[in-house]
């Protein structure tokens, strides 16, 4: 997104600093964010299999193990919902071999949060700006 902001003074690092200050010090902004975030955080999450086939049930069980037992799901939700504060959020997915249900599998072991204030830009595969 380049040049689409209504207020051109609120861009880049300055925008992130303003958003961070607003969410931390403005009670109205903080309350509005909480109203949206709390229902998501307090929801009991589950995963349904794609079908009743045993293969789909096994996939569901593996995904549940990764997301709810290996990865800290509540921490992920807290961090993921910061997209509401800043307009975007980035995670690095980390995979490692793990024994799950007696079999060694490549499992999602971490969703590493990359704080918005540490990201200034990145390039896409065609070397065009992704976020500027």
Name each model feature, range by range:
Residues 3-132:
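Structured, mid-chain assembly/scaffold modules that mediate subunit interfaces
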């Amino acid at each position: 997104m380049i040049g689409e902001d209504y207020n051109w003074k609120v861009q880049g690092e300055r925008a992130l600093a303003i958003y961070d200050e607003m969410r931390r010090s403005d009670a109205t902004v903080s309350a509005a964010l909480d109203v949206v975030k709390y229902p998501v955080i307090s929801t009991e999450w589950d995963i349904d299999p794609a079908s009743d086939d045993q293969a789909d049930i096994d996939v569901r069980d593996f995904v549940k193990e990764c997301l709810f037992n290996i990865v800290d799901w509540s921490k992920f939700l807290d961090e993921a919902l910061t997209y509401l504060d800043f307009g975007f959020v980035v995670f690095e997915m980390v995979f490692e071999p793990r024994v799950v249900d007696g079999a060694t599998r490549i499992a999602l072991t971490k969703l590493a949060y990359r704080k918005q204030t540490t990201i200034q830009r990145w390039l896409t595969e065609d070397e065009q700006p992704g976020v500027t």
